[in-house]
Amino acid sequence: MAEITVPYEYDGRQFEGMLVWDDSVAGQRPAIFMQPDWFGVCRHSAGMASEVAGRDYVVLMADMYGVGYGEREKTEAELLASAQGVRRDLPFILGCGAVAHAALTEEAEKHGLIDPERRGAIGFCMGGGIALEQVRAGADFKGTVVFHVTLPNPVDAAATPDFKGRVLAIHGAADPVTPKPMMDALEAELTGAGVDWQIMNFGHATHSFCVEGANNPPVQVYDEALCRQSYRLMRDFFTHTF
């Protein structure tokens, strides 16, 4: 797999996203814009991006936390504070997210990697909530997939959603971080907005079932089999979307 670090600036701050793709495969592929979990851009999230990309996609991974954040050691309290700070700041999510997507797309097009007509988005955990904010604000992705999403509901509940594409949420029925009422509210929002949506609810699954090393039952537990099944569902969803 190949990786390229892509720098960009937003509001006077420096960020570094990443392109991830299989360089043994020729030709243009769909571009999948990825909002990683609260660890940010690091070896952990690069590994997830590589799994997602496979031979099928080029992953454009956004950095929403700033240069060096991902590789720095952090306590859980620091992770939570940073992630919540980003998640609550809707203007930052939309502004920095748009700049990240533009910079990553420009770099991918420079290398002839992507088909600009086939654009999707994904997000893991807190990144899933961030991705949903982008698409409900009108970001033009043909399909969006969120895995064990955190805070799926809008910061600005009074705003009229402007979804452009399909949505798939892959979730754990026993996820205490994002319990059923939150997912029910997301379902109602998507239905009300006329979105072509799907929600796959895995029985007994907790939060972070795609995060290797997660082991804090009953809150979050990695499940390799469910994660692989999730990626198959994602691929099937995008195959029918593009």
What are the language-model segments listed below?
Residues 1-242:
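N-terminal cap/leader regions of alpha/beta-hydrolase-fold enzymes
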